[in-house]
Amino acid sequence: MDPNTVSSFQVDCFLWHVRKRVADQELGDAPFLDRLRRDQKSLRGRGSTLGLDIKTATRAGKQIVERILKEESDEALKMTMASVPASRYLTDMTLEELSRDWSMLIPKQKVAGPLCIRMDQAIMDKNIILKANFSVIFDRLETLILLRAFTEEGAIVGEISPLPSLPGHTAEDVKNAVGVLIGGLEWNDNTVRVSETLQRFAWRSSNENGRPPLTPKQKREMAGTIRSEV
């Protein structure tokens, strides 16, 4: 196993532990708590994939961070922070919409690279909007936290989420997954539109319905999604 993969996991575990302590002291806002929950799932998936114990990794990560901090001068730390571009966290969904449990009458699921697409194929003839919580950097989507499809009545009928075992995805991965989700929902004569925030940062071009036109590849994936069982 690559030692850098192990040390990266160890440091991520320790930093999550620090953030959890911050949350326990009620010092974190909604986006902070949102990322904390999502990262916990990601770490569990990575730990299972790597065969590493999270508690042991956390202790090792603490030693790595402490060693670095001892070697780091205050001036060097300031320069490093100043040179790192800041990302922004954008929220279409409320905390309740983000954390709400939902179920499907006719569940369909597809894994597209590092993303999991889920939708309820029982939904027909509905007006649906896609909302997402994500971070952006340089005016481009950086990390998708969660995307969900809502009916006008507020019911959740679809979702795109990162796979905990495959961390890391690109804006293009998200764009392709959105195309597959839209295609699957439109198959049953639903009308789908995308939130303005997601439309602005997830892609640059869209049609008059507020969503990107499907590529031939996305249409093929859409057809495969309709036929695939969970």
From Swiss-Prot:
Comp. bias intervals (Basic and acidic residues): 218-230
Subcellular location: Host nucleus; Host cytoplasm
Motif (Nuclear localization signal): 34-38
PTM field: Upon interferon induction, ISGylated via host HERC5; this results in the impairment of NS1 interaction with RNA targets due to its inability to form homodimers and to interact with host EIF2AK2/PKR.
Name of a matching Pfam family: Flu_NS1
Segments of this protein annotated with the region RNA-binding and homodimerization: 1-73
Motif position, Nuclear export signal: 137-146
Region CPSF4-binding, residue ranges: 180-215
Entry keyword set: Eukaryotic host gene expression shutoff by virus, Host cytoplasm, Host gene expression shutoff by virus, Host mRNA suppression by virus, Host nucleus, Host-virus interaction, Inhibition of host innate immune response by virus, Inhibition of host interferon signaling pathway by virus, Inhibition of host PKR by virus, Inhibition of host pre-mRNA processing by virus, Inhibition of host RIG-I by virus, Inhibition of host RLR pathway by virus, Interferon antiviral system evasion, RNA-binding, Ubl conjugation, Viral immunoevasion
Similarity-based family: Belongs to the influenza A viruses NS1 family.
Functional description taken from the UniProt entry: Inhibits post-transcriptional processing of cellular pre-mRNA, by binding and inhibiting two cellular proteins that are required for the 3'-end processing of cellular pre-mRNAs: the 30 kDa cleavage and polyadenylation specificity factor/CPSF4 and the poly(A)-binding protein 2/PABPN1. In turn, unprocessed 3' end pre-mRNAs accumulate in the host nucleus and are no longer exported to the cytoplasm. Cellular protein synthesis is thereby shut off very early after virus infection.
Subunit structure: Homodimer. Interacts with host TRIM25 (via coiled coil); this interaction specifically inhibits TRIM25 multimerization and TRIM25-mediated RIGI CARD ubiquitination. Interacts with human EIF2AK2/PKR, CPSF4, IVNS1ABP and PABPN1.
Record comment regarding domains: The dsRNA-binding region is required for suppression of RNA silencing.
Name the record gives this protein: Non-structural protein 1
Organism this protein belongs to: Influenza A virus (strain A/X-31 H3N2)
Lineage per the UniProt record: Viruses, Riboviria, Orthornavirae, Negarnaviricota, Polyploviricotina
